[in-house]
Amino acid sequence: MMLLNMNELLKVAKENHFAVGAFNVCDSVLLKTVIETAEANNAPVIVELAPPEVDFVGDEFFQLATERLRNAKVPAVLHLDHGKTVEDCVRAIRNGFTSVMIDGSELSYEENIALTQRVVEIAHAVNVSVEAEIGTIGAMSDSVEGGVENITYTKPEEVEDFSQRTGLDSLAIAIGTAHGIYPTGFVPELKLEVLDAIHQLTPDLPLVLHGGSSNKDEEIHQACLRGINKVNIASDYRKAFFSQL
């Protein structure tokens, strides 16, 4: 197969009404696990790392990662998760990432637009796709992906304006999920009506669901049917991995 930019992969997902799993890795074991599981299921895959994970593995790791992904038996993407600065994104691009996320969601709306525009300008010049975020994802525990204590839901009326002004390729939206492991007894509930409103206004824009761990399978399924084309998963499978060490 080949190492694609995410725009190419999510375009197919959008046209065929499915979502691609995106899995955070922080070492060669998790990288191997994610790729081999995707191959065993004949499923496309997005391998992603947040900046703290990039720091942990070091730049030399990405020669291995890009080579393995180029030779994967399924379509694959190497994606930067929750880059906070232009420098985060440039480092990823130089290391062979085919997609980057610039997360300016905690900035003002106009500052977020300006930051996203700058990253889009740089990334698109070298055929790298860009994910951005409006609204804020929650955080249930310390996580490399970040998050905030109080979720700010994405405003549907802002999505079309943000997309047109930035030229982004995909958008992470906040509809009630959180990064990390949910406390025992806590049952998250997605605001699917917010997703419906966003999808109605921007039907061609690939939408991304962060904090996918521990949500009900049926809710995730419904979200995918209603316009989500990328689902981020980290905490669930990391918990299973570390429980066996």
Question: Which residue ranges define each predicted feature?
Answer:
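Conserved phosphate/anionic-ligand binding catalytic regions in large, soluble enzymes, centered on
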Residues: F23
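Active-site neighborhood of phospho(di)ester-bond hydrolases with catalytic His/Asp-centered motifs
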Residues: L207-L209
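Alpha/beta enzyme core
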Residues: M6-V12, N16, C26-P52, D59-V77, ...
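Short acidic/histidine-rich active-site segments
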Residues: G211-N215, I233
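Basic/polar N-terminal segments that are highly enriched at the extreme N-terminus
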Residues: M1-L4
